[in-house]
């Protein structure tokens, strides 16, 4: 392989041990990997782990793989990991906090070199020096990365207020997580009076039922803020069941910027978040820890994308 790539055996070793970062050029690494592919070589991960004590694998723990947001998150983390010679193992907790905590504890003592925990608390016994990054949450002992959900929600609600809406309802997440508390706080701060609110999980059936309940009980609502674009899609279904046009009778704003929002009719105004960037940054923070550094936590910006689902009330 070294002969095929035109490099030394030690250079090949650096590439496949993951120790070549900063020591060999990207062109040289690409040549080595191309030679390996031509020769059909695949490194033995198990043998390497026994020899080095490192599995070159990180675990990403998420609450719901059925939500497309987490596909983007995985893609971002995986792309960054692959460039660094790591694999990403995905764990789905199915929104079970206890299972998430148990998974994190097991992975901490198991095959993963580091943990990326989405809305999962780090194991209580985990030292601050252990390679753990929390996503969309906060931990005193570990670096975190999250979206600026509060500012994004403020932008969405202000957009509705500027259009002239005064009666704004909130189809909120049923899950009591930091990001959803920030969204709820922003809505409560900006909307006058008591906010008409219902709760939904991130399925169309749940969102349809919740939005139907909200709109039936509060016929004076002219706009809805939804904690997710899937929830917004359920609100579309409820509005049409009740004979409400969008945006003529009801304006709707979602969150996350998922593809489903673009195919709704009309496309939903949404607070767009870059899930891939969130995953990439999370992995970079983890790599910094693995290199012995103490990276700072990050807050990533979001952006309101105004589409066809919002207009001035009649």
Where are these predicted regions, by residue range?
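N-terminal helix-turn-helix DNA-binding module of bacterial transcription factors
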Residues: 1-55, 314
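Short beta-strand segments enriched in small/hydrophobic residues
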Residues: 11-14, 50-64, 159, 167-173
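Short gly/ser/thr-rich secondary-structure transition/capping motifs
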Residues: 39-44, 98, 116-117, 236
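Hinge/beta->alpha junction and helix N-cap segments in small-molecule ligand-binding domains
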Residues: 45, 63-72, 91-99, 145-155, ...
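Alpha-helical recognition/docking segments in bacterial nutrient-uptake
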Residues: 57-158, 162, 214-216, 220
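Periplasmic-binding protein-like
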Residues: 104, 111-119, 167-172, 197-198, ...
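Flexible loop/turn connectors
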Residues: 217-314
């Amino acid at each position: 392989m070294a002969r095929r790539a035109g490099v030394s055996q030690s250079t090949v070793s650096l590439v496949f041990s993951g120790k070549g970062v900063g020591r060999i050029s990207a062109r040289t690494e690409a040549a080595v990997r191309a030679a390996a592919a031509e020769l059909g070589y695949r490194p033995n991960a198990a043998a390497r782990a026994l020899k080095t004590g490192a599995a070159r694998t990180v675990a990403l723990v998420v609450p719901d793989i059925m939500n497309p947001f987490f596909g983007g998150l995985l893609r971002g983390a995986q792309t960054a990991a692959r460039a660094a010679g790591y694999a990403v193992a995905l764990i789905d907790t199915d929104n079970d906090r206890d299972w998430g905590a148990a998974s994190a504890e097991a992975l901490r003592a198991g095959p993963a070199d580091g943990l990326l925990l989405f809305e999962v608390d780090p194991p209580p016994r985990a030292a601050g020096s252990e390679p753990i990054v929390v996503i969309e949450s906060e931990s005193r002992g570990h670096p975190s990365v999250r979206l600026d959900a509060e500012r994004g929600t403020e932008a969405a609600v202000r957009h509705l207020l500027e259009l002239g809406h005064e009666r704004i309802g909130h189809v909120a997440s049923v899950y009591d997580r930091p990001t959803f508390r920030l969204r709820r706080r922003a809505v409560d701060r900006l909307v006058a009076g008591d906010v008409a609110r219902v709760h939904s999980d991130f399925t169309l059936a749940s969102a349809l039922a919740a939005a139907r309940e909200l709109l039936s009980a509060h016929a004076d609502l002219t706009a809805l803020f939804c904690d997710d674009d899937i929830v917004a899609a359920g609100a579309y279904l409820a509005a049409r069941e009740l004979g409400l046009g969008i945006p003529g009778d009801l304006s709707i704003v979602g969150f996350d910027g998922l593809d489903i929002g673009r195919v709704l009719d009309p496309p939903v105004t949404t607070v767009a978040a870059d899930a891939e960037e969130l995953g990439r940054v999370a992995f970079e923070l983890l790599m910094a820890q693995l290199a012995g550094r103490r990276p700072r936590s990050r807050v990533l910006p979001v952006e309101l994308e105004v589409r066809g689902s919002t207009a001035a009330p009649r």
